[in-house]
C-alpha cells in the first residue's frame, strides 16, 4: 500500500484525533516513527494504516480522514510518486474547505513554493504520475491550497527532535480550539504560539487580520519565555477589535489552564450591577461555584492559589472596576507560576502600574480591511459575480474607514444587498455626516469625558496635525492652565481619542468626523453648548457674516473657521458683529487651497470702526487683514498665535499692550509694516516671521527682551540695513536672505544653528565669528561683495554645510580643517584651487572658469560621494577619483580631454550605486572614452554581488550608469545590433542562480541639434520568453542626464549610455522557476529615450547592446563557466585590465576575456584573440550576431588548456564527437 497514514497503539479509538498523510518510503521508519511516539506520549490519538487490513481500498483511508479532527500533511521529495498520497491530499482539501478539518502542512526538506507550484523534481514526478489522469486539475488545486496554509518547515539545518516537539505543540493548540462535535465553525488557526500557523481562506469567524494580532499578543504571553505570572494590557481606540482578539485568544488558550474565565462587557455590566458583583462573577467562573460570596472565599482563594489560571477581562472602563478585582488579581499573581491575566481597555491609563506589558491593537492594513468590508457587504452572496463592479466603490469605503474594523463591519452591513446607486448615495452622505452606528461607538467614550476634556477634544479637532506644543498652548488659559492643558492632552491620548506622532497631535479620520457631528448637534439643541463653526453656510447668511441664528447665542460661539476658498462672493462684516462673543477663542479667516496665502482676493469687507473686544481669543488668523492696525478695543491678554499674512497693517496696535501668552507671530508679506513696537512686551515670543515686509527698516531695541525667541525670519526685508546689538540666547535660526541693503552682520546670539545671509550686501563676516560653536549651516550664496572667507571659520567645529555659490569675487578658500563639514558649494566662484577637506561628502565646483585641473590628492577624500564639475570650461583632465564616489557630473566640461587610468579606485567589497556623467564633453579623447568603458565593465562585475546585499536582489534602480560622447557600443558587450530593438537567443541555463544582473548600452543621437532639454532618460523594456512561460515586460533604467537648478541645454553630439541593473523581477522570476530544465530562451529588448515622463521624439537610439553578468562559481570548472556572457573573477585586483579583449595572465592563471561574439574571433593555441573578421552585411546593415555552439566549445577547450584542465577538454571532445 503506497499510502502513509498513522494511528495509535491502542485499540481503534471511537474517533481519531490526528491523521498523518505522508510518503511511507521516505519517512515511515525515520521521522514519522518519532513523531508518532511523541504524539502518543501526549495522549493524542493518531491514525495509522496498520490497523486496516492490507489490500483494503483507499476509500477506507479517506473515511478515516473524514473522522479525524486534524491532518498532518508531510511533503517530502518522493511524495508525488504516490497516487495514494495525492488522493488523500485531495480529500484533505475538500474537508478543510467544508471547515470540518484542520490541516497543518509540514515541508520536509522542501520549500513551500516547490510544493505549491510543483517545481523541480517534485513537480516532474507529479506530472509523470498524473499524466493522462482526468483528476489532475483537482490535484493541482489541492497542491495550490494546502501549502498556502502557514506550516512548519524542516530543512537541512533543522534539529528534527525540536521540530517534532513543535508539531506536537501545534496539534495540542489546534485541538483546544476545535469546537464540540456537531459544530461547523471549525477553528482553522492551529499553530498558536509557534512560528507557524494555519488559515483556511474562508474566514467565517470574521477575524480578517487577526492572525498576526493574535501571534503578537501570544508572544507577550509566551509561557515558555515568561515562567512567572504575567498580566498583559490590550489597548486601542473604541471599535478597533480588542474584544474579537480576546475571544480568539481565550478560545485558543483556555485548554492550557486548569481554571479559566472570560468576563466581557465590564463597562456595561458595571452600570447595572454593584461593583462587588465583579469579583463574585470572576470567582464563580474560576472556582466553578454558582454563587460564591466574597465574605466566604477562603477556600476558592486557596484553590486559585494552587492552580495555573487564565483570566480575560474585556472592556474595562474605570479604575474602580480594577480596584474591585484587585484582591483576586493579587492572589493570582502570588499563586502558582504560569498564570496569565489579560485586561482590555480603551483607556491606557487604567493599566499603568498594573500590567507587565501592553499590546496596542493597530488599524487593519488595506488588504485585510478590504476583505472584512467585502465579507459584510456580500455576507449572503460571497460568490456574487458583480463584486468586481463594486470594487472601485469598495476602495472608497475602505479608505473612509482607515482600517477601523467596526466601521468596516458597519458600513459593509449597511450596504449588503444594496444596489450600486445606493452605494453611490451612501458615499455622498458619508461626506456630509458619519453613519449613526459608527457615531454611537465613539459616543460612549465621549460621554464619559469631563466637560473640560470634551472641550479639549473638540478644540483639538480644529487643530489636528499641529505641533503638540502649539495645541497645548492654545488650550492653556486663565481657567485652564498649562498643567491642565497637558493633562487634557494626555488623558485624551490615553483614551485613544487622539494620538501624538512625531511631536504632532493627530486624530483618526472617523473621530474627526465624529467631533464635527457633535458640534453640529449642539446647534440643533438649546444653544447652551459652546460651538465651533467651520461650514461657510453656517457663518455667511445673505452675503453677511452672521452666526446669530435660531436659538444659538453669540456668547456660546467658541471658534469661527472660515475657509475663504469656499466663499464665492464678497461678504460684509458688521462693525458690532463680535461685541457679544465674549467666549470666542479661535478666529480664522484662511485659504486652504493656497498654502502661501498669497493669491487670495480679500473677500471680506470690513468697516473702518470695527469693534473687536475679544479678550478670550487665543488664535487670530486673518488673511489680508485690511486695516492699518487692530482695533483699539482688541485685548491680546490671552493671545497665543497671531497670523496676519499679506495684510495692510502698518503696526499691530497703538501703544503698549500686555501679551504674556503670545508665542507665535506671522506678518509675512505685510508690505506696509513699518513698526514692531506692539511686540515690546512679548517676552515669551518663540517664532517671528516677517518675510517680505519690504518697508521695515529697523528693529526696536526692546526686542532684546525676547529671551525665548528661537526663529526669526527676515527674508526679503529689502529696507532692513542692520540689527541692534542684543543677545537672543534662544535664537537658533536666523534668516536674512535677500536683504539686499543689509551690509553688516552683528552677532546677536552665540547659539545660532542655521544662518542664512544669502543675497545680502555683507563684505565680511564678524570678527567674533568663532563664537558660533553650534552653527551647522552657513548660507552665503550670492554675496557678491564677499571677497574672502576668514581662517577662523575653521574653528566652527559643528559646521556641516557651507554654501558660497555665486560669490563672484571669492578667489581663495582658506586652508582650514573643519572636521564635520559635509557639504561645500563653490559653484559660480572664482576659486582657482580646489580645497582639500577630508570630511566633505558633497563638493560643487560647477560654473568655474578658472580651474584647469584637480589635485591628485582628491583620490584620498574617502568620504567624497558627490562631485559636481558641470561647465568647468577650463578643466582639461581629471585625476583618479576616490572609491566611494557615487556621482560625478562633468556635463559641459568642453575642454576635458583626458581622465585618469584607472578612472577611480574600486574596492573588492564594492557595493555603492554610482553615476558618472560626461555629457557634452566634446573634446574627450578616445583613450579617455576607452577608460570610461573599461571602468564601467569592472564596476558591473563587482556590483553583481549587490543584488545579494540589497533586499535579496530587489533593487530596481540602476546600480551603475555612465554616459559620454560616442557612437559605438563597447567591445565587451556580447550582443549588439543597429537600431533600438535587440533580439537575443540565450543559451540554456542562462537563468541559473549565478545570474547577477544585466549590463545595457544604448547609443543615442539628436535629430534636432537646436533642441534644448532639461532631462534625458534612457530605459530598456526587457522581455523573456521560453517554452513554458511568458513574463510581463519589465522596464530597466539604463542611464539619465538632468539639468539641475532649472534651465535647458543642447545635447548635440551622439552619446553612449551604459547601465548595470540587477533586473530583479526577471531574475527573481527565473530563480523561482526550474533552473535545472534545459530550455532555450529568447529575449527581446527595446530601448527608448524619454524627456522626463514621455518619449522624446527628437532623440533616437541607433545602436544598443546587452551582456548578462554572472557570479563565478568556484565549485565548477571553467569549461562549464564559459557559457556565461561575463564572468566575475575571484579578485579583480589580480587582473590587469584592458579594452582589447585579450586574455591577461595574472599570477599563473588566465582570465576569460569578454568578447563581442565567439564567431567573430579566431583563437590561437596560446589563447590570444586574433584579428577580428569583418562583420557580414545583410542589405547594407550589419547582420545581427549569433553565438556559434561549435566556436563556443572551441573557446572552452582553449581556456581549459590554459588552466591545465585536461580532463575537461577530453570530456568536451568526446561529447562533440
Swiss-Prot record:
Stretches the record annotates as Disordered? 1162-1195
Tell me one GO biological process term. signal transduction
- Which parts of the chain are LRR repeats? 260-285, 436-459, 614-636, 682-706, 708-728, 729-749, 750-774, 796-818, 819-842, 861-887
What positions constitute the catalytic site? 88
List the keywords (alphabetical): Hydrolase, Leucine-rich repeat, NAD, Nucleus, Plant defense, Repeat
**GO MF, any single term:** NAD+ nucleosidase activity, cyclic ADP-ribose generating
Induction comment from the UniProt entry of this chain: Up-regulated by AvrRps4 in an EDS1-dependent manner.
Q: Which Pfam families match?
A: C-JID, LRR_3, NB-ARC, TIR, WHD_ROQ1
Q: Which PROSITE patterns match?
A: TIR
Q: What is known of its domains?
A: The TIR domain is a signaling domain involved in cell death induction.
PANTHER family hit by this protein: DISEASE RESISTANCE PROTEIN RPS4-RELATED (PTHR11017:SF277), LEUCINE-RICH REPEAT-CONTAINING PROTEIN (PTHR11017)
Q: What name does this protein carry?
A: Disease resistance protein RPS4
Amino acid at each position: 500500500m503506497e499510502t502513509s497514514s498513522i494511528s495509535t497503539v491502542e485499540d481503534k479509538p471511537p474517533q481519531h484525533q490526528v491523521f498523518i498523510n505522508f510518503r511511507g518510503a521516505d519517512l515511515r521508519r525515520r521521522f514519522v516513527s518519532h513523531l508518532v511516539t511523541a504524539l502518543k506520549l501526549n495522549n493524542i490519538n493518531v491514525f495509522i494504516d496498520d490497523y486496516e487490513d492490507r489490500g483494503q481500498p483507499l476509500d477506507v483511508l479517506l473515511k478515516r480522514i473524514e473522522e479525524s479532527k486534524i491532518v498532518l500533511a508531510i511533503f517530502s521529495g518522493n511524495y508525488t510518486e504516490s497516487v495514494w498520497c495525492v488522493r488523500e491530499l485531495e480529500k484533505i482539501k475538500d474537508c478543510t474547505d467544508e471547515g470540518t478539518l484542520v490541516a497543518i502542512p509540514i515541508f520536509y526538506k522542501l520549500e513551500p513554493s516547490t510544493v505549491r507550484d510543483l517545481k523541480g523534481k517534485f513537480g516532474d514526478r507529479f506530472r509523470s504520475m498524473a499524466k493522462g489522469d482526468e483528476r489532475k486539475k483537482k490535484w493541482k488545486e489541492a497542491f495550490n491550497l494546502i501549502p498556502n496554509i502557514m506550516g512548519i518547515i524542516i530543512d537541512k539545518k533543522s534539529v528534527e527532535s525540536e521540530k517534532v516537539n513543535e508539531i506536537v505543540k501545534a496539534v495540542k493548540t489546534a485541538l483546544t480550539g476545535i469546537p464540540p462535535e456537531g459544530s461547523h465553525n471549525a477553528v482553522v488557526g492551529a499553530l498558536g504560539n509557534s512560528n507557524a500557523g494555519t488559515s483556511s481562506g474562508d474566514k467565517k469567524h470574521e477575524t480578517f487580520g487577526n492572525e498576526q494580532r493574535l501571534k503578537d499578543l501570544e508572544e507577550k504571553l509566551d509561557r515558555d519565555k515568561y515562567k512567572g505570572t504575567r498580566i498583559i494590557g490590550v489597548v486601542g481606540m473604541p471599535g478597533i477589535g480588542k474584544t474579537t482578539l480576546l475571544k480568539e485568544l481565550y478560545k485558543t488558550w483556555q485548554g492550557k489552564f486548569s481554571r479559566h474565565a472570560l468576563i466581557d462587557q465590564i463597562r456595561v455590566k458595571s452600570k447595572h450591577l454593584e461593583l462587588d458583583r465583579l469579583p463574585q462573577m470572576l470567582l464563580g467562573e474560576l472556582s466553578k461555584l454558582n454563587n460564591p460570596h466574597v465574605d466566604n472565599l477562603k477556600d476558592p482563594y486557596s484553590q486559585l492559589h494552587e492552580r495555573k489560571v487564565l483570566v480575560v477581562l474585556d472592556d474595562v472602563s474605570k479604575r474602580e472596576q480594577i480596584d474591585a478585582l484587585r484582591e483576586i488579581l493579587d492572589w493570582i499573581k502570588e499563586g502558582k507560576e504560569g498564570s496569565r491575566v489579560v485586561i482590555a481597555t480603551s483607556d491606557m491609563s487604567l493599566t499603568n502600574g498594573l500590567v507587565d506589558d501592553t499590546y496596542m491593537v493597530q488599524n487593519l492594513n488595506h488588504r485585510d480591511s478590504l476583505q472584512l468590508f467585502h465579507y459584510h457587504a456580500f455576507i449572503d452572496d460571497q460568490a456574487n459575480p458583480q463584486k468586481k463592479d463594486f470594487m472601485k466603490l469598495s476602495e472608497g469605503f475602505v479608505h473612509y474607514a482607515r482600517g477601523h474594523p467596526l466601521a468596516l463591519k458597519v458600513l459593509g452591513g449597511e450596504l449588503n444587498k444594496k444596489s450600486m446607486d445606493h452605494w453611490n448615495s451612501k458615499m455622498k452622505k458619508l461626506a456630509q455626516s458619519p453613519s449613526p452606528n459608527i457615531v454611537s461607538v465613539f459616543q460612549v467614550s465621549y460621554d464619559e469625558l469631563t466637560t473640560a476634556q470634551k472641550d479639549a477634544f473638540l478644540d483639538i479637532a480644529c487643530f489636528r496635525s499641529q505641533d503638540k506644543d502649539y495645541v497645548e498652548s492654545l488650550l492653556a488659559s486663565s481657567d485652564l492652565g498649562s498643567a491642565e492643558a497637558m493633562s487634557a492632552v494626555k488623558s485624551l491620548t490615553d483614551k485613544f481619542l487622539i494620538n501624538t506622532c512625531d511631536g504632532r497631535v493627530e486624530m483618526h479620520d472617523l473621530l474627526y468626523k465624529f467631533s464635527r457631528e457633535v458640534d453640529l448637534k449642539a446647534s440643533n439643541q438649546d444653544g447652551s453648548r459652546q460651538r465651533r463653526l467651520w461650514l461657510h453656510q453656517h457663518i455667511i447668511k445673505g452675503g453677511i457674516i452672521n452666526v446669530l441664528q435660531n436659538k444659538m447665542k453669540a456668547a456660546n460661539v467658541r471658534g469661527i473657521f472660515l475657509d475663504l476658498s469656499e466663499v464665492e462672493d464678497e461678504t460684509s462684516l458688521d462693525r458690532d458683529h463680535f461685541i457679544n462673543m465674549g467666549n470666542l477663542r479661535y478666529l480664522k479667516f484662511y485659504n486652504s487651497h493656497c498654502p502661501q496665502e498669497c493669491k487670495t482676493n480679500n473677500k471680506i469687507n470690513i468697516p473702518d470702526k470695527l469693534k473687536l473686544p475679544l479678550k478670550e481669543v487665543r488664535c487670530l488668523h486673518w488673511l489680508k487683514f485690511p486695516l492699518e492696525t487692530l482695533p483699539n478695543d482688541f485685548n491680546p491678554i490671552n493671545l497665543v498665535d497671531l497670523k496676519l499674512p499679506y495684510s495692510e497693517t502698518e503696526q499691530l496696535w497703538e501703544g503698549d499692550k500686555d501679551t504674556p501668552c503670545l508665542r507665535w507671530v506671522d506678518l509675512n508679506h505685510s508690505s506696509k509694516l513699518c513698526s514692531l513696537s506692539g511686540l515690546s512686551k512679548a517676552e515669551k515670543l518663540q517664532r517671528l516671521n516677517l518675510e517680505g515686509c519690504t518697508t521695515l527698516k529697523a528693529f526696536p531695541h526692546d526686542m532684546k527682551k525676547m529671551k525665548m525667541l528661537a526663529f526669526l525670519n527676515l527674508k526679503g526685508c529689502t529696507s532692513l540695513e542692520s540689527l541692534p546689538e542684543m543677545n537672543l540666547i534662544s535664537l537658533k535660526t536666523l534668516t536674512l536672505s535677500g536683504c539686499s541693503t543689509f551690509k553688516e552682520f552683528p552677532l546677536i546670539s552665540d547659539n545660532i544653528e542655521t544662518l542664512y545671509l544669502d543675497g545680502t550686501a555683507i563684505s565680511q563676516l564678524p570678527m567674533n565669528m568663532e563664537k558660533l560653536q553650534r552653527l551647522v549651516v552657513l548660507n552665503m550664496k550670492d554675496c557678491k561683495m564677499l571677497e574672502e572667507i576668514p581662517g577662523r571659520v575653521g574653528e566652527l567645529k559643528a559646521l556641516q554645510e557651507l554654501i558660497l555659490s555665486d560669490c563672484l569675487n571669492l578667489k581663495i578658500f582658506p586652508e582650514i580643517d573643519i572636521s564635520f563639514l559635509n557639504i561645500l558649494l563653490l559653484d559660480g566662484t572664482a576659486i582657482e584651487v580646489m580645497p582639500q577637506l577630508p570630511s566633505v561628502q558633497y563638493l560643487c565646483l560647477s560654473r568655474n572658469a578658472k580651474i584647469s585641473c584637480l589635485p591628485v590628492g582628491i583620490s584620498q577624500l574617502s568620504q567624497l560621494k558627490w562631485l559636481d564639475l558641470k561647465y568647468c570650461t577650463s578643466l582639461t583632465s581629471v585625476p583618479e577619483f576616490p572609491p566611494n564616489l557615487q556621482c560625478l557630473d562633468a556635463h559641459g566640461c568642453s575642454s576635458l580631454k583626458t581622465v585618469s587610468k584607472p578612472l577611480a579606485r574600486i574596492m573588492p567589497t564594492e557595493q555603492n550605486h554610482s553615476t558618472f556623467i560626461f555629457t557634452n564633453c566634446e573634446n574627450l579623447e578616445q583613450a579617455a572614452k576607452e577608460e570610461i568603458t573599461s571602468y564601467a565593465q569592472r564596476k558591473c562585475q563587482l556590483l553583481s554581488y549587490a543584488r545579494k546585499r540589497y533586499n535579496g536582489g530587489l533593487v530596481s534602480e540602476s546600480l551603475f550608469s555612465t554616459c559620454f560622447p560616442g557612437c559605438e557600443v563597447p567591445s565587451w558587450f556580447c550582443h549588439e545590433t543597429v537600431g533600438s530593438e535587440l533580439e537575443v537567443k540565450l543559451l540554456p541555463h542562462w537563468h541559473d542562480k549565478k545570474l547577477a544582473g544585466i549590463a545595457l548600452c544604448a547609443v543615442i543621437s539628436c535629430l534636432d541639434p537646436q533642441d534644448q532639454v532639461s532631462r534625458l532618460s534612457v530605459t530598456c523594456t526587457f522581455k523573456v520568453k521560453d517554452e513554458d512561460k511568458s513574463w510581463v515586460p519589465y522596464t530597466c533604467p539604463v542611464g539619465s542626464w538632468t539639468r539641475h537648478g532649472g534651465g535647458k541645454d543642447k545635447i548635440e553630439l551622439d552619446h553612449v549610455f551604459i547601465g548595470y541593473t540587477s533586473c530583479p523581477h526577471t531574475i527573481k522570476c527565473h530563480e523561482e522557476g526550474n533552473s535545472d530544465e534545459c530550455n532555450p530562451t529568447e529575449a527581446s529588448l527595446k530601448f527608448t529615450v524619454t524627456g522626463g515622463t514621455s518619449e522624446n521624439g527628437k532623440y533616437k537610439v541607433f545602436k544598443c547592446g546587452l551582456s548578462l553578468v554572472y557570479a563565478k562559481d568556484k565549485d565548477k570548472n571553467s569549461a562549464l563557466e564559459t557559457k556565461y556572457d561575463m564572468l566575475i573573477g575571484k579578485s579583480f585586483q589580480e587582473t590587469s585590465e584592458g579594452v582589447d579583449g585579450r586574455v591577461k595572465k595574472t599570477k599563473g592563471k588566465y582570465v576569460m576575456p569578454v568578447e563581442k561574439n565567439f564567431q567573430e574571433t579566431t583563437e590561437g593555441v596560446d589563447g590570444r584573440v586574433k584579428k577580428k573578421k569583418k562583420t557580414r552585411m545583410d542589405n547594407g546593415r550589419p547582420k545581427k550576431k549569433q553565438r556559434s555552439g561549435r566556436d563556443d566549445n572551441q573557446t572552452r577547450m582553449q581556456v581549459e588548456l590554459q588552466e591545465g584542465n585536461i580532463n575537461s577538454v577530453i570530456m568536451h571532445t568526446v561529447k562533440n564527437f
